[in-house]
Amino acid sequence: MTPDWRTFPGPLPQRDGNQAVWRGGLVGCGALSAACLLRHHAAPLGVPLPDRDTLAGHLAAAQGAFRLPLPQGPRATWPWAWLSGLNTSLNDRNLPLRARGRWGFHLHAPLTAHLDRLFSAGLPVIGFEFSTREQHYGLLSAYSPGPELPARLHVDGSSMHLAPRIGLGGVFWIETVSLP
């Protein structure tokens, strides 16, 4: 069966590829995707932010990114640390934005509903897969509501699965909120 791809309707953030080196290893896909998403939401607010790679380094520290014992020293961060680290950065900058997320096991229906709502609202989404096949965070350009909830990455069109049979999957986004 051919996937029914639903493409993001608006302009997407800066691509989250070509990770910079930070503290002796790659900055990590979690921090890099968060930096691209934050810059996308801060620009219309007129908020000056560091360049993508510098911001990714700040976010990697806030998200508690840790090096994996592999060549090139890739980094990883847990989904709850990704979310709390980005929200700490948003709070520290007094931005009227909050990061949100949903992740877990076999969440095909709830994640499809979130993607439908977020894409319809023109809100860019970061996908998350932690499975035997892939361990990655990345900005999404499309998704297909099917088994394992496949999604296309904005950076290069490759795929990830947001509801893998074995492992965790999820989505993250930023919303505008009213500050007191």
Region locations from a protein language model:
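Active-site-adjacent structural segments surrounding the nucleophilic cysteine of cysteine proteases
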Residues: 1-79, 131
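Conserved active-site-adjacent core of cysteine acyl-enzyme catalytic domains
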Residues: 57-180
